[in-house]
């Protein structure tokens, strides 16, 4: 399918914006969703004529439904839905408040759930589609303790994604479900974390947004269930869970992840 319609949340910056631009270069139709309207429209302008910006807060179910409605009204279909919106935190487990925990679940898990539940009936009616949930290496290995509730949220997102895949596997084999797990990416993720944090763009060895988005683009073209933004990350996860004491392998963390 060469003329895909791709919905990307969290598309005003970072991985989402970079993926939108790559998708535009492929000639695909792109629906970009985010809260920040000026930045979103700037990205849409770079994507080109086949871009549809939708200002929305994906932690609100009605806003997510509005994204789908806008996509269908403009393009008539959706082929790929990328749940990319998210936010980090810089607090230890012992410091978390109810509000902190709820915010991490709302932004990182509920937003993806709303996306899944909005687009899934459309995919089921067509018998095909692709849902991609952007998770994190921190959803597999707790390299950074101060990410606490963010790590927990990404673990929850991974479980939600895996369960959805099993739910659809037999009856809807052409609806693909992907967990995408990047490590440290050179975005404003760190400075935008709840409680602040180190600028991810200044961490040596951080993966560029262009490279990370390129891996995501390949996932869209060649759907797989579980994809890491760098191939060596999979071995790091295997090594962690193979350890009897669940010790993080020395020197095995993605670049910069041992730092807050």
Language model segments and positions:
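Active-site helix of classical SDR
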Residues: 116, 153
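Substrate-binding pocket helix/loop in short-chain dehydrogenase/reductase
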Residues: 92-93, 100-102
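Residue(s) in the substrate-gating loop at a strand-loop-helix junction
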Residues: 136
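Conserved glycine-rich cofactor-binding loop
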Residues: 12-13
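The beta1-alpha1 cofactor-binding region of Rossmann-like NAD(H)/NADP(H)-dependent oxidoreductases
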Residues: 56-66, 98
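C-terminal helical subdomain
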Residues: 179, 198-236
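Conserved glycine-rich Rossmann-like NAD(P)H-binding loop of the short-chain dehydrogenase/reductase
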Residues: 26-42
